[in-house]
Regions:
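Glycine-rich phosphate-binding/hydrolytic loop that grips phosphoryl groups
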Residues: 262-282
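Phosphate-binding/catalytic loop of phosphoryl-transfer enzymes
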Residues: 107-110, 115-188, 220-230
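N-terminal phosphate-binding loop and adjacent alpha-helix
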Residues: 40-90, 179, 184, 192-198, ...
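Short glycine-rich phosphate-binding loop at a beta-alpha junction
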Residues: 74-84, 106-109, 238-249
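Gly/Thr-rich phosphate-binding beta-strand-loop-beta motif of the actin/hexokinase/Hsp70
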Residues: 4, 8-45, 139, 146-169, ...
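Phosphate/pyrophosphate-binding loops at sites that engage ATP/ADP/AMP, CoA/4′-phosphopantetheine
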Residues: 63-77, 98-99, 230-242
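Active-site rim beta-loop-alpha module in soluble metabolic enzymes
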Residues: 176-237
Length: 282
């Protein structure tokens, strides 16, 4: 998708020239927003700040407007990476409306796999979720030199992906996250209730002494076991010396089963920032 102008930033200017650079990670549950403060910080990764989360399935425009006007007092460009097209389209339309009504120039551009500093060793890279690729791009910069890496992203879905020692994205595994597992049990049976599993990273009791507690135990401990096994399989496939990088909203729930993992909370946004750097000619 090419550049989309919510408001023109003037003739002859590049997509980011002189503008505040904003980032949007549009996921299945949340839209994660941030401002890009530094294209290349000391650790080699961009610095993101002023984080704001919105509900992907419905957010109040006023919340987006307050954040947007607070982080970008002048012209801005927002780089959008999305795995949820309807939410991304609504975000872009709302940004365009805010730009028009407040007379603040805001340009918009989608980030695709071709914008990331990442070689994708798959036949159809355009079909891989941009969130997975963005996380891998960031991980390839922070992993130890000469070693492969396994990236675990704990979101609506869990992804366990592999980056080769030379930085190539090799693919990985995807499984439902705890909320999806709970919803599948509630929707696919006549009597099992919907439960909240792994809320706040708290581990459920085992044995569960009610139906709800038993579901929470099955999901909570089951997903921890699944993640640990997938990481072990990925490390074995890579020769056993892969670094493990952990991110996502409920990452704390699996941290103890991945004791050697390095936790990077905003790994996907950081990867999107790398794509922004390329899009902005940095």
């Amino acid at each position: 998708m090419g550049d989309r102008a919510a408001s023109s930033s003037g003739p002859g200017r590049g997509i980011c020239a002189g503008d505040t650079v904003l980032l949007a990670d549009v996921g299945n549950s949340r839209i994660k927003l941030a401002r890009l403060d530094d294209f290349a910080a000391d650790a080699g990764l961009p610095t993101v700040a002023r984080r704001q989360d919105l509900d992907s399935r419905g957010f109040h425009p006023d919340n987006l407007e307050r954040w947007l006007l607070g982080v970008a007092p002048g012209p801005a460009v927002i780089l959008v990476a999305s795995v949820y097209e309807a939410a991304a389209t609504r975000l872009e339309a709302t940004v365009a409306e805010i730009s028009a009504t407040t007379h603040r120039p805001v340009r918009q551009r989608r980030i695709g796999h071709q914008d990331l500093p990442l070689a994708v060793a798959l036949d159809e890279p355009h079909k891989v979720g941009i969130d997975r690729l963005a996380a891998a791009a960031a991980a390839s910069l922070v992993k130890p030199a000469g070693r492969p890496a396994v990236i675990v992203d704990c979101g609506t879905a869990v992804t366990v992906d592999m980056v080769a020692a030379d930085g190539r994205f090799l693919g990985g595994a995807i499984l439902p996250g705890p909320a999806l597992m709970a919803r599948a049990l509630a929707d696919g049976t006549s009597k099992l209730p919907a439960v909240a599993a792994l809320v706040g990273g708290e581990l459920p009791a085992m044995p569960g002494r009610s139906t709800e507690a038993a579901i929470a135990a099955g999901i909570g401990h089951g997903i921890r076991g699944a993640v640990a096994r997938l990481v072990a399989e990925a490390r074995a496939a890579s020769g056993g010396d892969a670094a493990t990088i952990l991110t996502g909203g409920w990452a704390d729930a699996v941290r103890d089963v991945l004791p050697d993992a390095v936790v990077i909370p905003d790994l996907v946004l950081t990867g999107i920032a790398l794509g922004a750097g390329r899009a902005c000619g940095r």
